[in-house]
Amino acid sequence: DIAGATQELERAVLDGCRGAFVAPFTLSSKSHGHPDHDALWGKAQELDVPIAIHPMAEPGPITRGNRFRDLGNDASWYYNVLARQGIQQAFYSFFQYGVFDRFPRFKLVVLEAGAGWIGASLDRMDAVRDSMADGKQSLPLKELPSTYFRRQCWISADLAQVGDPLCHRGIIEG
């Protein structure tokens, strides 16, 4: 319910909240970046508050993007390791649909998904965009994904995790 979410965001900010978070899935099965959600991103931009993607328990049918038939519901370790993929998919959809061009002051935060993966993802996102620059691409971006990330995105890092300190140094110092 985008209209309801937009109203709730405005109410919460008027009550003192400084941002909001969304689950890494949608009940409509439309990705976060889809234009159907533009009213919410526009309201966040208008209110000058960030929106974060935060993990949470996902309904069974939504969680299973499973390629393997032998891993059932008893594979909780496996599914927990892959939990960040839902957050990544939601994150990537903002680029796929050009949200950062439509809302140049919109701020997006990625929470609780580690940060060690973001460098490789930005490299890949930029490379794929460049390789598709012949007009046949489906990515409607005016700039490189890494440019939008540096300007409009933040990611939480846990310096106790193996990859995050290296990523932290690269993003902060580089």
Language model feature labels by segment:
Residues 2-4, 9-174:
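Catalytic pocket-lining loop regions of alpha/beta-barrel enzymes
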